[in-house]
Curated annotation (Swiss-Prot):
Classification via Pfam families: AAA (PF00004), Prot_ATP_ID_OB_C (PF16450), Prot_ATP_ID_OB_N (PF17758)
Region (Docks into pockets in the proteasome alpha-ring): 577-578
Pathway info: Protein degradation; proteasomal Pup-dependent pathway
Gene3D superfamilies assigned to the protein according to its UniProt record, in alphabetical order: 1.10.8.60, 1.20.5.170, Nucleic acid-binding proteins, P-loop containing nucleotide triphosphate hydrolases
Residue stretches in coiled coil: 8-84
Record note on domains: Consists of three main regions, an N-terminal coiled-coil domain that binds to protein Pup and functions as a docking station, an interdomain involved in ARC hexamerization, and a C-terminal ATPase domain of the AAA type.
Gene Ontology terms, MF aspect: ATP binding; ATP hydrolysis activity
Role noted for this protein: ATPase which is responsible for recognizing, binding, unfolding and translocation of pupylated proteins into the bacterial 20S proteasome core particle. May be essential for opening the gate of the 20S proteasome via an interaction with its C-terminus, thereby allowing substrate entry and access to the site of proteolysis. Thus, the C-termini of the proteasomal ATPase may function like a 'key in a lock' to induce gate opening and therefore regulate proteolysis.
Keywords of the record: ATP-binding, Chaperone, Coiled coil, Nucleotide-binding, Proteasome
Protein name, entry field: Proteasome-associated ATPase
Residues annotated to bind ATP: G267, C268, G269, K270, T271, L272
Protein family per UniProt: Belongs to the AAA ATPase family.
Length: 578
C-alpha cells in the first residue's frame, strides 16, 4: 500500500512517527527531571498541536487522492464507451433450426448468431434487432414506428403477405409483421410500410372513407322534428316497413326501394329526417327481435368527396359502398346518405369547366344497381336543386321514392316552435300571469302570436315582387320563405334578448315581445339576401318552382317607409341564397 502513496504522503507519515517519538522522549525526560516539567509540558502541547495539524493535512490529501482515482476510473469508462464501434439495426425475418437468425440489414439479408442474453422464443416477425460490430444479435428492440403509408389491395392466400398500393399507384407485395397477423384487415385500409425490409407493421386509423362518413347514428328521433308529419310517414313506409315486414314483402313479391330522394328548399329538415331514419330503424328492429339493435348511418359529405385527381372520386364512392356492404353483411341496416347530392351527381354534359360528372354518375349507378343483391342497404339523397341531378339516378329502380320537404305553413310552424319553446324555459312572470299562471297556456299563447306575426299578409311582411316570363307579377311575403332553421333562429334571438334584459334591468324570463322583435330582426337581416342577378336560379334553390322568373324587386319596409326596389341590371349586392 505504501508503494501506491505519493512521496509527500510518505514524508508526512515519517514526520508523524518522528514527532510521536519525540513526545515519548519528552515524557521520559519529564519523569526523570520533574523540575523541567513546565517547559516540557509546553513543548508537549506544541508538539501535539503540530501532530493534529499534520494528521488533518494527511487526511485531506488522502481524500483528494481518492476523488482523483474515481475521476480517472470514470473518464476511462467514458473513453472506452466512446471508443466502442457503432451498433447496427436489422429486421428479424426468421429463426433457423440451429438457432441462427435471418436478419435484413443494410440492404442485405444475413444469417447471424445471437447472444445468449437474447430470448429467441420471444422474437416476432418484423421486430427490430440490435447488432454488434460482428453483426451478431445482442438485443431485441421494438417494432418500427415510421415509414410510408400504403393502401391494402388484398391479402394473399398464405395469410402472411399482402398486395398493397404505394405511391404513384405502384403495386407491391409485402410481408405482414406479427402485430398484423391477428388483425382483421380489409381492402382500403391504410398500413405503415417500412420500405427497405418490406414489412407492414400497423394499421393506420386514417381510412379515406372514414374522413368522409359518419358511421355512428346521431341521437335524433322523429319527435325532435316538427311540421313534417306527412314526410315522416312517407319515409317510414319507404325505409322501415321493408325491414320490419320482410315476410309480407316476399309474399306480395314486392322489392324494397333502393333509394329515397329528399328535396326541397334549404333549412326545412332534409338532413334532420335522414339522421332520424337510422336511429328509428334500429329501435324498431330491436323491439321486434328483442335484441339490442344497431344501425349505421354513412353520412357522405358530397363536396369533400370530390378530388382533383382523375379516378379518385370514383374510388371513394366504391369504398363507401364497400363499407356499406360490410356492415350490411353483419345483418345491420345501413343507410348511405348523400347530402347536397346535386354537387356530386349533376346531369352529364352540364359541366361548365369539367366533365367529371361523366364518370362519377355511372359509378354511382353501378353501385346502386349492385345494391340489389343486398338486403340491408338503402341510399338517401338530399338536395335543394333536384333539377340538376342526373335523370338516370332519379328514375324508378334507383331512387324509387321522392319526398318533397315543403316550407312550413302556419300549422307546421306552430309544431316547430313547440320544439324550441317549452315550459322548462324561464318565462316572464307578467306573461305567465296573463294566462292565469298556466305555463303551458303561456307558451301556446306566445307561439300563436308569433306565428300570426310571421304569416300575416300585411304590408310589413311584404318581401319581394317577382315578375314572370309571361309578364305576370306576384308579391311574396316572408312566410313564403320561412323554414325550420329560420324559426329556430328566431327563438334563439328571443332567448338572447331575454338574457340581455335580465343583465340590464334584472327582469328574468322570456316575453312575447322578445319573440315578436326577433321576427322583425330576422326579416330585416334577410332583406339583402335575394340574388337579383340570377333570379331564376335563386328562386329554384329557394323552392319557388313554376314559371320562369325574370325580375325581382324587394319590398322591405325601412325606417322611413318602403325602400326602392332593385332590378337585376342595377343590383350590386348579389348576396347569398336565402
Amino acid at each position: 500500500m505504501a508503494g501506491d502513496e505519493s512521496p509527500t504522503a510518505a514524508e508526512l507519515r515519517n514526520q508523524v512517527r518522528y514527532l510521536e517519538a519525540e513526545v515519548a522522549a519528552l515524557r521520559r525526560r519529564l519523569l526523570e527531571h520533574p523540575a523541567d516539567g513546565r517547559s516540557l509540558e509546553s513543548r508537549l502541547s506544541e508538539t501535539q498541536a503540530s501532530l493534529a495539524s499534520v494528521t488533518a493535512q494527511n487526511e485531506r490529501l488522502a481524500e483528494t487522492l481518492r476523488e482523483a482515482r474515481e475521476k480517472i476510473i470514470a473518464l476511462k469508462e467514458e473513453v472506452d464507451r466512446l471508443a466502442q464501434p457503432p451498433s447496427g439495426f436489422g429486421t428479424f425475418l426468421g429463426r433457423n433450426d440451429d438457432d441462427t437468425l435471418d436478419v435484413f440489414t443494410g440492404g442485405r439479408k444475413l444469417r447471424v448468431a445471437a447472444s445468449p442474453s437474447v430470448d429467441l422464443d420471444a422474437l416476432k416477425l418484423g421486430q427490430e434487432l440490435m447488432l454488434n460490430e460482428a453483426l451478431n444479435v445482442v438485443e431485441a428492440c421494438d417494432f418500427e414506428v415510421v415509414g410510408d403509408v400504403v393502401m391494402l389491395k388484398e391479402l394473399l392466400a398464405d395469410g402472411e403477405r399482402a398486395l398493397v398500393i404505394a405511391q404513384a399507384d405502384e403495386e407491391r407485395v409485402v410481408r405482414l409483421a406479427s402485430p398484423l397477423l391477428d388483425q382483421a384487415l380489409r381492402a382500403g385500409d391504410s398500413l405503415l410500410l417500412e420500405p427497405r425490409s418490406g414489412y407492414v407493421y400497423e394499421k393506420i386509423p386514417k381510412s379515406e372513407v372514414e374522413e368522409l362518413v359518419l358511421e355512428e347514428v346521431p341521437d335524433i328521433d322523429y319527435t325532435q322534428i316538427g311540421g313534417l308529419f306527412g314526410q315522416i310517414e312517407q319515409i317510414r313506409d319507404a325505409v322501415e316497413m321493408p325491414y320490419l315486414h320482410k315476410d309480407l314483402f316476399l309474399e306480395h313479391e314486392l322489392k324494397p326501394p333502393k333509394g329515397v330522394l329528399l328535396y326541397g328548399p334549404p333549412g326545412c329538415g332534409k338532413t334532420l329526417i335522414a339522421k332520424a331514419v337510422a336511429n328509428s330503424l334500429a329501435k324498431k328492429v330491436a323491439e321486434k327481435t328483442g335484441v339490442e339493435g344497431r344501425s349505421f348511418f354513412l353520412n357522405i359529405k358530397g363536396p369533400e368527396l370530390l378530388n382533383k385527381y382523375v379516378g379518385e372520386t370514383e374510388r371513394h364512392i366504391r369504398l363507401v359502398f364497400q363499407r356499406a356492404r360490410e356492415k350490411a353483411s353483419e345483418g345491420m341496416p345501413v343507410i348511405v346518405f348523400f347530402d347536397e347530392m346535386d354537387s356530386l351527381f349533376r346531369t352529364r354534359g352540364s359541366g361548365v369547366s369539367s366533365d367529371v360528372e361523366n364518370t362519377i354518375v355511372p359509378q354511382l349507378l353501378s353501385e346502386i344497381d349492385g345494391v340489389e343483391g343486398l338486403e340491408n342497404v338503402i341510399v338517401i339523397g338530399a338536395s335543394n336543386r333536384e333539377d340538376m341531378i342526373d335523370p338516370a339516378i332519379l328514375r324508378p329502380g334507383r331512387l324509387d321514392v321522392k319526398i318533397k320537404i315543403e316550407r312550413p305553413d302556419a300549422e307546421a310552424a306552430r309544431d316547430i316552435f313547440s320544439k324550441y319553446l317549452t315550459t322548462t324555459l324561464p318565462l316572464h312572470a307578467d306573461d305567465v300571469n296573463e294566462f292565469g299562471g298556466d305555463r303551458r297556456e303561456c307558451v301556446n299563447g306566445m307561439i300563436q302570436r308569433t306565428v300570426e306575426r310571421m304569416y300575416t299578409e300585411a304590408d310589413e311582411n311584404r318581401f319581394l315582387e317577382v315578375t314572370y316570363a309571361n309578364g305576370d307579377k306576384e308579391v311574396l311575403y316572408f312566410k313564403d320563405f320561412n323554414s325550420g332553421a329560420m324559426i329556430q333562429n328566431i327563438v334563439d334571438r328571443a332567448k338572447k334578448m331575454a338574457i340581455k334584459a335580465f343583465l340590464d334591468d334584472n327582469q328574468k324570463g322570456l316575453r312575447v315581445q322578445h319573440l315578436l322583435q326577433a321576427c322583425v330582426d330576422e326579416f330585416k337581416e334577410n332583406e339583402d339576401l335575394p340574388n337579383t342577378t340570377n333570379p331564376d336560379d335563386w328562386a329554384r334553390i329557394s323552392g319557388k318552382k313554376g314559371e320562369r322568373i325574370v325580375y325581382i324587386r324587394t319590398l322591405i319596409s325601412g325606417k322611413q317607409g318602403t325602400e326602392p326596389g332593385r332590378s337585376i341590371d342595377t343590383a350590386t349586392n348579389t348576396g347569398q341564397y336565402l
